[in-house]
Amino acid sequence: MKILKWLSVADRFYKVYLDKQLAPYGINSSQHMFLVKICGSPGIQQDSLMDMFYVHPSNIVRTIAALEKQGMVTRSPSDQDKRTWNLYPTERALSVIDEIQDACKRTEDILTQGFAEAGQEMFGDFLMQAGKNIAAELHIERKEDEFND
């Protein structure tokens, strides 16, 4: 039960910390990963985010709507499939994405404080494998290597 307890503790408190870091930009710890990906891949299809983040499509729709309302993202219908959207960062998003990524890096640094560099890499690999293990047990399939960083 030690693993479950400390995963829960780390999850709750990193979100509290990251929310405080991201508040000046009008986003939160549930939205940052979407914005980072959209800024790094302008025009990305909204549907592809499901495979990257292991979240339900309705969560993606709500998150993108919130980012759009905050002036961080714009949507346009996909030329290939009119049922989905291509997502683009706004100038506002591009102007703050470096600070957002810095806040994420600081949060990861705090989580891995006291770890050797190799230990930090292993910790990330172990967490990724743990996530894939539980997803597989629940028969949740995603495309491999879509967002392994």
PLM region descriptions:
Residues 65-128:
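Charged, amphipathic alpha-helical coiled-coil/dimerization segments
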